[in-house]
Design a protein with these regions (language model features):
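Positively charged, small/polar-rich N-terminal and surface patches that mediate targeting and assembly
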Residues: 1-112
Length: 112
């Protein structure tokens, strides 16, 4: 099993969710996040004072799947989240040793 974590622009969430559904992903976890990388921040004026806004709003998507779905899921996220501009995000793929459904006690792929 693998876990995909994707950090994307918030306005791309619906497109990414739909793209993942089309490749057979049935459930995702979404977390609002803030961060910066190459995109960096920007300066805003508030009541005559300048403020540097370092952290920009992002969305983190987490999904665990069987190994055979990983490449299709990564491609779906890349295509749906792509704008061609700095700040499109990142995708991380990690190995999951075990998954357990708390309600039933199911383990492994049956738990996801």
């Amino acid at each position: 099993m693998k876990k995909i974590e994707a950090i994307i622009k918030p306005f791309k969430l619906d497109e990414v969710k739909e793209a993942l559904h089309e490749v057979g992903i049935k459930g995702i976890t979404v977390t609002e996040a803030k961060g910066f990388g190459r995109q960096k921040g920007h300066t805003e004026l508030y009541r005559g004072a300048e403020y540097v806004v370092d952290f920009l709003p992002k969305v983190k998507i987490e999904v665990v799947m069987e190994d055979n779905l990983v490449e299709r899921a990564v491609e779906a996220i890349q295509q749906a989240a792509h704008t061609g501009r700095i700040g499109d995000g990142k995708i991380f793929v990690t190995t999951i040793e075990e998954a357990i459904r708390i309600r039933t006690g199911e383990r492994g792929p049956d738990a996801i």
